[in-house]
Amino acid sequence: MKALVAEQANHFRSRLEPFGVVVNELTGDSQLTKAQIAETHVIVTTPEKWDVISRKSSDTSYTNLVRLLIIDEVHLLHDDRGPVLEAIVARTIRRMEQLNDPVRIVGLSATLPNYQDVAAFLRVDTASGLLYFESNYRPCPLRQEFIGLTETKAIKRLQLMNEVTYDKVMEHAGKNQILIFTHSRKETAKTAKFLRDSAEAREALDVFLPQTGTSRDVLREAAEDAQDANLRELLQYGFGIHHAGMTRADRELVEDLFAGRHIQVLVSTATLAWGVNLPAHTVIIKGTQIYNPEKSRWCELSPQDMLQMLGLSLIHI
């Protein structure tokens, strides 16, 4: 979520700064003083942070200035953040009714099956304020391929999944950028190293290496700047990793390298799926189960999570 906030804040800042509009981000990584908040026209923040600010009934001088509330990824209502979003919306609507002070509430989502229910919750006039776009509005057609593994033993299944991932990566290596989603932080580096080692054993590593001297120089300098040891090791081979356990500087470094097409394969957790705009030609979702520590068992990914990852791809495996 912090990665999304940082990206959106930078995007709006670059677009609005020429017009004198001040944009700031407000998260656990970046704090703002009351004076800075008062001078800010657009605040990009997380639900939890805005919940803390808006619930202070003793000081509403800043929240009363808000005239537009945009909730990106509004489908998070079904997630653990759902109650926080509900509280923010309810608090905003109550303030509008008490003060007769209108605030426009906009909800955005790429994966919202029950959009009519959410529209009703946000008090949207469905005749004029509800916009729904089906898949045929997508500018690039999406081809999906699902591969089922019948192996029951965990170790063999993981090995087979690695082999299938390598085969699919090699179908596009050297031609298109590839984004691979894994479901744990450790698995990002393990998967990237497996792909590198497998390609090296088959003498096929050249297809992943930068083809231009400029990209090679960029990756060499990036590897020197990277703080994560696994990232430093992998960058020189044209591979990148991305997860919430990395420093913000490393995450932004990887995002810039992938956007600049300097690295060909990026292995990530779901942090990239939730709003960071890094589309790839091919997306591989390595496994459809994620470990839930609260339930102490493996659970299937929700349809919303799958669709979020699909949204970054032209091809899903």
Regions found by a protein language model. Give the residues of each.
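Conserved two-lobed SF2 helicase motor
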Residues: 38-54, 238-241, 260-273
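A short beta-strand element within the Helicase C-terminal
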Residues: 265, 272-288
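Conserved nucleic-acid-binding Ia/Ib motif block in the N-terminal RecA-like helicase ATPase lobe
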Residues: 2-44
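Conserved C-terminal RecA-like helicase domain
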Residues: 13-24, 186-265, 293, 297-306
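Post-DEXD/H (motif II) to motif III coupling segment of the RecA-like Helicase ATP-binding lobe
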Residues: 76-135
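Conserved helix/coil segment N-terminal to the catalytic DExD/H
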Residues: 29-67
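Conserved interdomain linker/interface between the two RecA-like ATPase lobes of SF2 helicase motors
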Residues: 104, 115-123, 127-194
